[in-house]
Structures are given as C-alpha cells and as structure tokens.
UniProtKB/Swiss-Prot annotation:
Cellular component GO terms held in the UniProt record: host cell cytoplasm
Biological process according to GO: regulation of translation
Intracellular or extracellular location(s): Host cytoplasm
Native source organism of the sequence: Cauliflower mosaic virus (strain PV147) (CaMV)
Main location (coarse class): host cell
Pfam family, one: Cauli_VI
Protein name: Transactivator/viroplasmin protein
Lineage per the UniProt record: Viruses, Riboviria, Pararnavirae, Artverviricota, Revtraviricetes
Amino acid sequence: MENIEKLIMQEKILMLELDLVRAKISLARANGSSQQGDLPLHRETPVKEEAVHSALATFTPTQVKAIPEQTAPGKESTNPLMASILPKDMNPVQTGIRLAVPGDFLRPHQGIPIPQKTDLSSTVAPLRAESGIQHPHINYYVVYNGPHAGIYDDWGCTKAATNGAPGVAHKKFATITEARAAADAYTTSQQTDRLNFIPKGEAQLKPKSFAKALTSPPKQKAHWLTLGTKRPSGDPAPKEISFAPEITMDDFLYLYDLGRKFDGEGDDTMFTTDNEKISLFNFRKNADPQMVREAYAAGLIKTIYPSNNLQEIKYLPKKVKDAVKRFRTNCIKNTEKDIFLKIRSTIPVWTIQGLLHKPRQVIEIGVSKKVVPTESKAMESKIQIEDLTELAVKTGEQSIQSLLRLNDKKKIFVNMVEHDTLVYSKNIKDTVSEDQRAMETFQQRVISGNLLGFHCPAICHFIERTVEKEGGSYKCHHCDKGKAIVQNASADSGPKDGPPPTRSIVEKEDVPTTSSKQVD
C-alpha cells in the first residue's frame, strides 16, 4: 500500500517537470532561437519543486490517507493532453538567451533609438512672422465740453465723464493724433483752453479737494411721494448714455458719395433708390449693422428688410428697436413673416460750431412681401458743401408731405413717438383717440419753419402752400416779423448811409403758432 502511494506521488512530480519542460520549449520557440537543437536545456530547480522534494524527504506513511473512490474515471490524475500550466500563468525563467519582452514591439522604430539632430536651425518649418500676433487696440475719446472735458484712453472713464451732464459732446478716434487734432480744432474755434490728455489711472471724476467740493453745485435729490411704500435708501442711478458719436459733415459726404456711385456690383445686401440729387439706401437681410446705423444717422435710408433676429437694426436707437420687436410679437399672428421699415427722414444740418440739427424720421412698419430690388445705377456726384442746405430743404419738404398724408389714413396704430421720431403701422381698426393726439402733437412740433434747426423761409412757404390747398391756414412769427421790418424800412423817408442791416437767416429753434385743419 505504501509503495502505491509513493509511486503516485512520484508520478505527480514527473508530470510537473514535464509541464515545466514543455513551457520552456514553447518560450524558446516564441523567441525564435535557432540554437534550440544544439544547446542543451539547462534546468534550474524552481522554488516550488524544492518544496516538493523537501516534503518527500519528511514523508511518513502515517501522514498519507487513502484517496476516496471516484465515480467518474480520469479524475485522479492530470490529463497529459490538456495544458494545465500556460506561459502566461508562469513567472519568466531566466536562460542564457534574452527573452523577448512584449513591450519592445510597442516602441517606435522597434525599440531602436533614433539620434536627434544637433542643428537648431531647420529649413523645413520656417519661423512664423511676428506680424500675425494680434495686439489689443486702444481707442481714444475726446470729450469736447462739460465739467470733465479732455482726451481719454478708456471708455469707462469717458462714460463716467458724460453721464448726467446734458449737452456734452464726445467722439471716438483710432489714434491719439486724430484725437488731438480734433480737440485742438474745437478749442481753437471756441477760443477755449487746450484739452489735456487724461490717462486711465489719472482720471479724477470727483472734486479733488474740500474747497472744490464746496464750490461744486449741490446734487438735487429726487422727491419721493410715499403712499404706504418704503422710501428707497438712495437716489436712483442716472441712466447710462450709450456711445453714439454725432455724425460729422465728412461722414455724411462719404455716405452720400457712396450711395451715388454704388452700382449694385459685389454686394447683394443692399440696393439704392436713385433720384436727381440724392440716392437712398435699401438694406436687405445680412446687411452690415454698423453701416445701417451710420446711414440712419445721416438720414439716407429709404427701406430696411431685416432678418427674423433683427440683427441688421441692432445698433439703431433702443426705443425704435423695441417698437419693432413689439410689432413682431403683438401685431402680427405669424412672427416668422418678414417685415419692412419704410423711413422718411430729413438730413443733418451743420454750422461752424458743429451739428445743428439731427434728422427727424417718420417710420412705417409692415409685413413684407417678396422683395424686388430696383437696379442701382452709378450716378454723378457733384454736391458741394454749399448745396447741403438746399438738399436739407428738399428732404424737409418731403418729410412734411408724408406727415400730412397721415391725416388721410383712418386706421393707424402708433408704435412709438419721441421728440424727433414717429413709428407707426397699419391697423385693422380705426385710429383711437390716444394715437390721434400723439400724431397731432408730433405734427405740431415738427411741421414748422424751424424744422431744420433754423428758420427757413422756403420751408414756411412750402407749408403755407400745402396747408392752403387743404383749406387751412398757417402763420409764422418769424415771417410776420420780417414783413414788419420791411414795411417799416420802406416807410422811413430819412437819409440812408447804406443798405439796412439784414438779420441772419440762421436763428435758434422757436416753435411758431400755427392754425390749420391738420395742425392745430
């Protein structure tokens, strides 16, 4: 019995050695060694095998128990046809030949190091030009008048210098040279002190000393009427004034020439309506919003066909833009329909001191059908500075005519009315009394001889002729005073040393009293 147990134990040991030899053979084949048949295999006794031999040395028959009888054959020994020990389950065995490590096959160039070039200069990738690096651009702002007049290089300081100060003029320039030239030209014409350059860190927008604080005018606090509600802890902050520089005569002449010379080539976002003396812009979808704003300030727009997101008019005055948004959401059922803005406007008027009159616009909003652009033609541009007043009178007469035509329309909805802007649209119902009063108030303020910022006899004569055709009457204080001066001069029979002095045709704006069927 004891001999059988020893033989079984020896059989297991031999099977382990056989499996170990087979594993070495498979490793040698994987290594691709060509000396497999020449070199004898040097066997090293592993730690596990030494433990088996030591167990056999101390083996005693009393420690061996009989193996229980198995019901299934072939379960008492290892099957020699099935590999019970795979190479991945064994620790690597060191032999005379270096084993291949799988990591070598994952290295670039099969593990062969590639020497790097010592030359720093390379002609394959030339150095990039430093001109491609974008540097932040600094704008300069000139505040011409007011308590904080000067030249600033930061818009935050400029906005703080202009907020809460009515009548302050300011403009943006790209370089300090342009800003200095504009500031010197203004101070020379006004005969005032030269404006100083105020950097961002040195802007003092508050009194510098206690004495200046005492001499500064006191701040007027708002009087709050409390009816059961708590009074606010502080005064309301002044409204921010958006940066909208006034249009200059040079800007207007540039846009005027652009409209006269535009022939429709190379730009499908706009077309022009050409008349004998002026060309007006018609902007379509995807037009440049900045150009739309400049043309609007110049009074050179006839129609705007904006996109659904109204990106073309995003730089127009906020109240005009809000009126258009309300029209889309409240006045039409299908908010995806295209709309139009039809504008009738005057043009600006300048004097030596600067801008005298801003354009006054009458804007009609409606649902647009298919846009059929007219053919833009390159027109001859021979306008001179002396001709601007005549052109302003012509546009003023057309604006008055379009305003008087509103009286013939019985179904009008007033979307927005301001001092110099009226926005309206067609309505399915009759005009309500509130909208009628708003239109009449706007007509009384605009339809006068002072439409262009100064008393213009040609405008007065045009209003008088137009109103008389409708059976009304129109009177102007300036024209009556002029007639009285002429009559008094003709009645005087005394000697005359020379021609009588003539009054200046440019006077400050004064609203005349009118009486007519359209204008009360």
